[in-house]
Amino acid sequence: MNKFTVALVSTLLLGMLRITVSAQPLENEAVSADEPSAGGKLCSENGDCAADECCVDTVFEGDMVTRSCEKTTGNFTECPGLTPIAKK
């Protein structure tokens, strides 16, 4: 009975360890363009960005917002107010 208990516990622990290790991302996985960390320099207002960039809010998956500098697409003399951009 004692050997059976040790074998059962060992099997369960090894199985849990394998699941935990396989769930971790690999070191060489590339960052997706849809991930928040793939954006430009983080900012809190337009003054934090370069001359040709504006501070823009980007919404991810409906409830997560990041604010980063992005190149302006128009001929603005000033950046418009902070604009949310939704990404899925």
Curated annotation (Swiss-Prot):
In which tissues does this protein get expressed?
A: Expressed in salivary glands.
Q: What is its main location?
A: secreted
Task: Note the SS bond partners.
Answer: 43-55, 49-69, 54-79
Q: Where is the signal peptide?
A: 1-23
Record's keyword terms, sorted:
Disulfide bond, Ion channel impairing toxin, Neurotoxin, Secreted, Signal, Toxin, Voltage-gated sodium channel impairing toxin
Tell where it localizes.
Secreted
Q: What is known of its domains?
A: Adopts a novel structural fold that may be an intermediate scaffold between disulfide-directed hairpin (DDH) and the inhibitor cystine knot motif (ICK).
Q: What does this protein do?
A: By inhibiting Nav1.7/SCN9A sodium channel, may prevent signal transmission caused by tick penetration and the blood taken, allowing the tick to avoid discovery. Weakly and specifically inhibits Nav1.7/SCN9A (IC(50)=1.6 uM). Significantly shifts the steady-state inactivation curve of the Nav1.7/SCN9A in the hyperpolarized direction. Does not induce changes to I-V curve and conductance-voltage relationship.
Q: What else is known?
A: Negative results: shows very weak or no effect on human Nav1.1/SCN1A, Nav1.2/SCN2A, Nav1.3/SCN3A, Nav1.4/SCN4A, hNav1.5/SCN5A, and Nav1.6/SCN8A sodium channels. Does not show obvious effects on potassium and calcium channels.
Designated name of the protein: Sodium channel inhibitor ISTX-I
Question: Which species is this UniProt entry from?
Answer: Ixodes scapularis (Black-legged tick)
